[in-house]
């Protein structure tokens, strides 16, 4: 019988305690659980990029995949597993990590029934330091692009197509991007992609929105919405300084109130 907090609380009746002591945990087959992380960031050209790892073992040996791994049963939660895997692959500890969806098709992994809890991690521009984990041959940041055949992932190492990815990871990535495009219209997700959340211009935030949405936005309307939703509500505060750009712009600071919304 597992020593859970409920058992230690002393709230069990003698009958329930006897039931738990005699319970056979092998009565039902159990799937394994993995945490897979869609790690998104921006390159210097403000293009949306994703971290992929090249698998070093079977199945799908040599194929590109999302960073992730098995949850250590009885030792961590699936969210803790996602944070651990993200840190092992990137060295990032404080990313905006959000649960995306649970993928549980019984045939998604040729080894056994594996349930994947997928997460989206938004990494500030310029802060992603790639390092392949123990079970990967390589790790690379790819630019996400689209052509007539669908989504591609491009880097100096070549072009990877959706169908070239391991498992059902193309489906996971598509869902993550679709969800981000929806959320960015009403949630502060874009702030987590800023290079410096403590000192940024409206134009930087607008560029991120345009990249995610893949469309041009009107600056006047964007500024109006930004001031209304963030400055007037105290979630962002103006700084008494301007940027060093050719046309200096007012700089802003993301407050702790807005940071706590992501915790």
Place the predicted regions along the sequence by residue.
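Solvent-exposed residues in well-ordered beta-strands and their adjoining turns
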Residues: 40, 122-124, 255
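Conserved Nudix-box catalytic region and its N-terminal flanking loop in Nudix hydrolases
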Residues: 47-88, 92, 183-211
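Short acidic (Asp/Glu) patches
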Residues: 83, 98-105
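Nudix hydrolase/Nudix homology domain
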Residues: 1-10, 14, 64, 126-263
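N-terminal strand-loop-strand
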Residues: 17-18, 22-65, 79, 94
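Acidic pyrophosphate-coordinating catalytic loop
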Residues: 28, 103-115
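A short coil-to-beta-strand element that immediately follows conserved catalytic motifs
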Residues: 93-101, 218-220
């Amino acid at each position: 019988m597992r020593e859970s907090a409920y058992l230690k609380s002393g709230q069990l009746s003698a009958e329930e305690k006897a039931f738990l002591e005699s319970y056979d945990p092998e009565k039902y087959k159990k799937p394994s659980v993995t945490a897979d992380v869609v790690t998104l960031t921006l390159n210097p050209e403000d293009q949306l990029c994703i971290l992929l790892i090249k698998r070093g073992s079977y199945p799908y040996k040599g194929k590109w995949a999302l960073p992730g791994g098995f949850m250590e049963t009885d030792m961590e939660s699936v969210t803790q597993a996602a944070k651990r895997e993200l840190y092992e692959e990137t060295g990032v500890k404080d990313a905006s990590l959000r649960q995306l969806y649970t993928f549980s098709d019984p045939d998604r992994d040729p080894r056994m029934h594996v349930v994947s809890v997928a997460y989206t991690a938004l990494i500030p521009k310029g802060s992603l330091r790639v390092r392949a984990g123990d079970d990967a041959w390589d790790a690379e940041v790819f630019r996400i692009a689209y052509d007539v055949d669908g989504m591609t992932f491009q880097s100096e190492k070549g072009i990877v197509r959706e169908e070239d990815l391991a498992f059902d990871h193309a489906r996971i990535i598509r869902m993550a991007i679709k969800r981000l495009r929806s959320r960015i219209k009403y949630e502060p997700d874009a702030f987590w992609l800023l290079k410096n959340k403590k000192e940024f211009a409206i134009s930087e935030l607008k560029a991120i929105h345009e990249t995610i949405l893949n469309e041009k936005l009107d600056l006047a309307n964007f500024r109006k919405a930004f001031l209304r939703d963030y400055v007037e509500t105290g979630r962002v505060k103006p700084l008494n300084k301007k940027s060093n750009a050719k046309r200096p712009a007012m700089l802003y600071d993301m407050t702790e109130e807005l940071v706590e919304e992501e915790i």
